[in-house]
Structures are given as structure tokens and as C-alpha cells.
Amino acid sequence: MIIFPAIDIKDGVCVRLMQGDPDRVTVYGKDPVSVAKRWEGEGAGWLHVVDLDGAFLRRPANRQVVASIVKAVSIPVQVGGGIRNLEAIRDYLDSGVERAIIGTAALRQPEILEQACGLYRSRIALGIDARDGLVAIEGWKETSGTDAVALAKRFEKLDLAAIIYTDIHRDGMQSGVNIEATKRLLESCSIPVIASGGVHTLQDIEDLLPLVPLGLLGVITGKAIYSGTLRFKDALARVREKCGGATPSPNPRRGE
């Protein structure tokens, strides 16, 4: 199981929001590049970067910051936020980003996700952000009538690297991961899942470990590692202890 440190960028700095609300923001670092290097130094194998301005503006808004992060670290970076067309996907992947995350566009224009998966095999992730089980879009400002599991199953045959599943009610709240909803998604779909939202302590990491055999690829942690309720090194050590130090395949489809 991979532990992804989250770097959320707003107005060029590293922040965390509560439940995606731009009015409930805490700044955790004025230099996202330094933050990225910190997590790499602590042993991170991946970075999860979100362009929050991009999510709200519907277009990438912090490309230069992301490019600087990619150049500064030697570990792979996945990026989401405001990626609505093939041009944005190409620009990110050509700049050295390993994986682009498509959320809103997957629901609004599914052909973009389909084309991207054909062009960039296993370098595309589907971002599913759910509020009470329903997919939220446009920077979480709108809640659709589409069930999260139904959306995942719709794209099951595509060459997706992963689904990044976020429980909006828990994001930034440090109230524990929604194990039940994550398990439901894993049991319904063969695409690997990265869980997000609600990590608070080491216990939350341990609670996710039984889901690894079901296809859980990793977990994203943000506020917990910035506020200090979870030490990143402790989380890594616990996963290595329980999983035997094995590194999962970047695209481990069940049944393949």
C-alpha cells in the first residue's frame, strides 16, 4: 500500500481545505517545492498534488508550481485539479508528471477520459469525489445524481491506473477514512483504488490494510501529516511491517 502525501496548491502556496471549502483554508507551507522535497526526504514513493485554483477555475492554474515540484524531486508525481481536456493532460504528462487525474471531465465529457486512456496507457487516474455516495464535480461545488460505484463500473474496461476515491464529508476533517464506502467500491470494480479523506492517526492506516487484498493501491494523507496527528515515517514503517515491504504494481488489476 502506497502512502501519498498530499500537496494542495492555492494561490501558489501549500494549503489544506476543510471539506473542499475555499473559505476554510489553512496554509501549511509557502513553498510547495520545499514541502515536496520534505516528503521525499521522509521516504515518500509518490506525491499527490492538487491544483485547487485549477479545480475552481476549470483549467490548470498552477502549472509552473507543479513543473517546479516535478523537477525538484526524483519520485513520481500525480496531479489533479482543473484537468478538463486532452491538451491539459498532454501538457502535464510532457512536463514530467507521471499520472493525470480526471474528475469532472469524466462525468461531463467521458470521451476525454476514454481518449486519454488510449493515448497514455496507465498514466490516467479517475478521480471520484463523493458526497453521500454521489459524485461531486466542479471543485465539489455541484453534486450530481450519479452513484460513485456506477461511475467506476462505467469505465472499468479502460486502461486506468487507479481510481482516487475521496469522501468529501471526511476530507480535511480527520474523522477517519470511510472504510465501508471504500470497500464497497473495491468489491464492485476491478480497478485499483486509492483512498482519500479522513486520515487522522496511525490507526486509520491500519484500518485500511485489510483492504489491500481487495485491490487497495494506496491512501492519500494531508492534514494529518501537516498538523502532526500522524507522523509520515510512522505510517510508512507500519505499512512495511504489515505488508512485508512489498511495493505494489502501479496498475495491479485483480484477475490479471
UniProtKB/Swiss-Prot annotation:
Superkingdom: Bacteria
Reactions that this protein is recorded to catalyse: 1-(5-phospho-beta-D-ribosyl)-5-[(5-phospho-beta-D-ribosylamino)methylideneamino]imidazole-4-carboxamide = 5-[(5-phospho-1-deoxy-D-ribulos-1-ylimino)methylamino]-1-(5-phospho-beta-D-ribosyl)imidazole-4-carboxamide
Biological process (GO), any one: L-tryptophan biosynthetic process
E.C. designation(s): 5.3.1.16
Entry annotation: catalytic residues: D8 (proton acceptor), D129 (proton donor)
Coiled coil: none
Keyword match Magnesium: no
CDD domains (UniProt xref): HisA
NCBIfam families to which the protein is assigned, alphabetical: 1-(5-phosphoribosyl)-5-[(5-phosphoribosylamino)methylideneamino]imidazole-4-carboxamide isomerase, PRK13585.1
The protein's name in its UniProt record: 1-(5-phosphoribosyl)-5-[(5-phosphoribosylamino)methylideneamino] imidazole-4-carboxamide isomerase
Organism per entry: Syntrophobacter fumaroxidans (strain DSM 10017 / MPOB)
Organism placement in taxonomy: Bacteria, Pseudomonadati, Thermodesulfobacteriota, Syntrophobacteria, Syntrophobacterales
Gene name of this polypeptide: hisA
